[in-house]
Amino acid sequence: MAGLKEVRERIKSVKSTQQITKAMKLVSAAKLKKATSRIVTMRPYAEKLQEVMSNILATTDMSELSLGLNEVRPVQKLLVVVMTSDRGLCGGFNSNLIKASKRLLSEKYADFNKKDITILPVGKKANEFFKKSGYEVHEDFVNLFQDLTFEGSAKIAQFIVNSFLAKDFDKVEVVYSKFKNAAVQEFMCEEFLPVAKSSSHASSTKADYMFEPNKAQLLEELLPKIIKTTFHRYALDTNASEHGARMVAMDSATNNAGDLIKRLEIDYNKARQTAITNQIMEIVGGAAALEA
């Protein structure tokens, strides 16, 4: 069994670590509250905008539109946006996002040459991983989460739109974490461009709308806004998921530290009791020897 001094130092060290993890948990909880508030604030606007577009697309022959952003062409160049956090200590959050992106590439794009795939990392952990992976990495937007704003998200979305319209890429995929609650994150891979016709967001109410100006002009105005809003939603979800994952990880670490402290205190008491018992036995033995 370890000596008294060694156990005492270990208890002191674990208590110090416990204070750090508890503080990090509280900070993450505060950041999570702010992040979820931003999601709730933006969601009604994003959902309504998506509903308007879906209602238009549901009654439109996409082949009649020539907006550029809905152009489906053979995929020769692929852009994959991978969102992660900048920092660790958030459990398996970053590794699960990287696994999701690797699975996307190995399953859906297994026939692609690495030189035909560009990774756009948003978050330092994604950048650190993919710089060593052999893919071309576009590093201009790594630091979005240092100061997450709509303007920052819109800048990345505009770069993606411009690149797609210039035919630098034929398809864009986004890997991000969809926020459910502090303990649950859903790791998503979604096709971002070209814009696909989808009825999942369309209103269930049947109505015959009159559009002024015409649908093509309306979509031309709406699509860039929707694309920027959608990308910002991905970023907000990932940001909230990060803080939730870190809060849970630090809570678990704090509890584990508490359990370890209890076990160490038991070891300390046992060692102390053993030392006292040995001293008593030495004294008794010495006294008996003198009497003899």
What is the meaning of each model-derived region?
Residues 1-292:
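C-terminal beta-strand-loop-alpha-helix "lid" module of Rossmann-like NAD(P)-dependent dehydrogenases
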